[in-house]
């Protein structure tokens, strides 16, 4: 008879033998999450309506025409180019939901919008066509660019949908020099579109949100959304708005317009990319504006000082360059509980990084999985200390040691209480120097 063997849960076996458990050593998963994820709603001439769609920076560069309907260099994509200068991933939302798809005898545009009117169908005879069996080559053009070719097609039902059109299910193919799609329209942007966007955005993770609408009711809506998400839900991000002095660390208020239009909100995408894409150990102070717009920097020294005092994110001119004046948010009401440090976006980046990373760590590794005993709390302490040590290694915080973190049992058997002291590092901004001449 064979000896006993296998694995064990408790030491209650009867037969002699070797009972061996193989368990992976727990790995600390308290790593720093990456930044550079942002979201923004925009009016567009092409693309899916009424829902968020995600675009990576590399996809935008290579496939902008398929995604947005235009070549990468087109003027219509300037807001997208601006935001991708410093963002890696963007959750876009196309505003307007009542657009009409352009169409012709053979095809219907993939999406509603005026860009569909630039599509056209060209049908020529295939080289193998005969009277008994006509064959056609069917081309789809966007402007002057061929975007699809299907050769040797006998019937319209043989055509396969492409990135630009869906073919109609009935009809007869015939030689066509150029048949445009017509009657495509953009949907009218309504205030309710912004609420639809915000409702959908709750399910996504991002570092910054932007809004190019300057209407007071809309900016107030976005500011309230950011405050609710940050303070009530625990989802930490900053929202970039135009001249919205919300007196809140979660709202960045951009003051500058353009030289051609001082009230233009065109800089919002660039700032959104910067706020979301700047590393946790970096500051955007004195960052050079590398976008395509002519920024209005017609401010006096006093106006710049007042802008900082009121909580405005501003640009100013340094020789031939346009630079960020200082990397601040709209918070100005300093209290004993909230010092002036909370007006620094670099400080908020550090605090948001800690909040988001530890929440993810707890949810994935501890929630409902690790017992709330001394060993479990020590494990959580170890992971938090490891996370903060990484922040200190990249000079995002300073003067940190394990003694700054305590993990204790809460008021109930299921709760755990963490007390955490951190000192965020900020970049140098002012130099006070006294030179003694002998």
Where in this protein do the model-derived segments appear?
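Soluble or luminal CAZymes and related metallo-dependent hydrolases
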Residues: 72
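C-terminal edge-of-domain segments
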Residues: 406-438
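A glycine- and small-residue-enriched flexible loop/hinge signal that marks low-structured segments
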Residues: 2-47, 52-60, 66-67, 75-371, ...
């Amino acid at each position: 008879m064979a000896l006993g063997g296998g694995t064990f849960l408790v030491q209650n076996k009867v037969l002699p033998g070797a009972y061996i458990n193989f368990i992976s050593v727990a790995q600390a998963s308290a790593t720093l999450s990456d930044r550079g994820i942002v979201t923004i709603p925009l009016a567009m001439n092409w693309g899916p309506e009424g829902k968020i769609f995600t675009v990576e920076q590399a996809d935008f560069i290579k496939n902008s025409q398929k995604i947005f309907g235009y070549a990468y260099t087109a003027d219509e994509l300037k807001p997208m180019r601006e935001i991708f200068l410093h963002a890696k991933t963007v959750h876009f939302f196309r505003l307007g939901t009542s657009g009409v798809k352009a169409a012709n005898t053979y095809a219907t545009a993939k999406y509603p919008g005026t860009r569909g009117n630039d599509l056209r169908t060209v049908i020529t005879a295939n080289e193998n066509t005969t009277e008994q069996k006509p064959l056609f080559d069917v081309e789809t053009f966007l402007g002057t660019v061929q975007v699809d070719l299907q050769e040797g097609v006998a019937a319209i039902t043989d055509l396969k949908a492409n990135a630009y059109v869906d073919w109609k299910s009935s009809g007869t193919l015939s030689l066509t020099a150029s048949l445009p799609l017509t009657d495509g329209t953009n949907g009218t942007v309504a205030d309710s579109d912004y609420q639809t966007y915000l409702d959908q955005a709750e399910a996504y993770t991002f570092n910054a949100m932007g809004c190019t609408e300057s209407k007071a009711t809309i900016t107030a809506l976005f500011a309230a959304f950011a405050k609710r998400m940050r303070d009530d839900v625990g989802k930490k991000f900053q929202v970039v708005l135009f001249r919205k002095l919300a007196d809140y660390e979660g709202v960045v208020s951009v003051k500058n317009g353009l030289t051609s239009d001082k009230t233009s909100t065109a800089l919002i995408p660039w700032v959104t990319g910067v706020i979301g894409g700047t590393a946790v150990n970096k500051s955007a102070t004195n960052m050079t504006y590398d976008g395509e717009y002519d920024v209005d920097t017609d401010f006096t020294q006093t106006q710049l000082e007042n802008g900082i005092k009121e909580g405005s994110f501003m640009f100013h001119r340094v020789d031939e360059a346009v630079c960020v004046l200082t990397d601040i948010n709209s918070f100005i009401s300093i209290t004993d509980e909230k010092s002036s440090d909370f007006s620094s976006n670099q400080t908020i980046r550090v605090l948001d990084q800690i909040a988001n990373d530890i929440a993810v760590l707890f949810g994935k590794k501890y929630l409902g999985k690790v017992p709330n005993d001394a060993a479990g709390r020590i494990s959580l302490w170890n992971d938090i200390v490891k996370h903060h040590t990484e922040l200190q290694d990249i000079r995002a915080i300073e003067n940190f040691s394990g003694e700054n973190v305590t993990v204790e049992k809460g008021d109930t058997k299921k709760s755990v209480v963490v007390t955490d002291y951190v000192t965020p590092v900020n970049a140098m901004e002012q130099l006070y120097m006294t030179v003694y001449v002998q």
